[in-house]
Amino acid sequence: MDGFDKTMKFSIQDEKQSVHVNDVLLTVYDALQEKGYNPINQIVGYLLSGDPAYIPRHKDARNIIRKLERDELIEELVKSYLKQHREE
């Protein structure tokens, strides 16, 4: 039971990964928009469920987004949000 009380440390990879995540999100966003979907709703659906059916195959978006773990995508979104709002 003692092992359950310990805080786990989550390590972050270097900033090179951030650029890649940014490119993936923008590519997927554009593909969703071109297909007439609400990109935010679809990306959130994918991030929450892990179901790739939220992302179309258009422009290979489904394969592109699946190259990254969902936690990497969420991490980049949180970092970007906090950076933008802490500078205001």
Swiss-Prot record:
Pfam families: IreB. InterPro entries: IreB. It comes from the Bacteria. Transmembrane segments: none annotated. Coiled coil: none annotated. Belongs to the UPF0297 family. This is UPF0297 protein Bcer98_3100. It comes from Bacillus cytotoxicus (strain DSM 22905 / CIP 110041 / 391-98 / NVH 391-98).
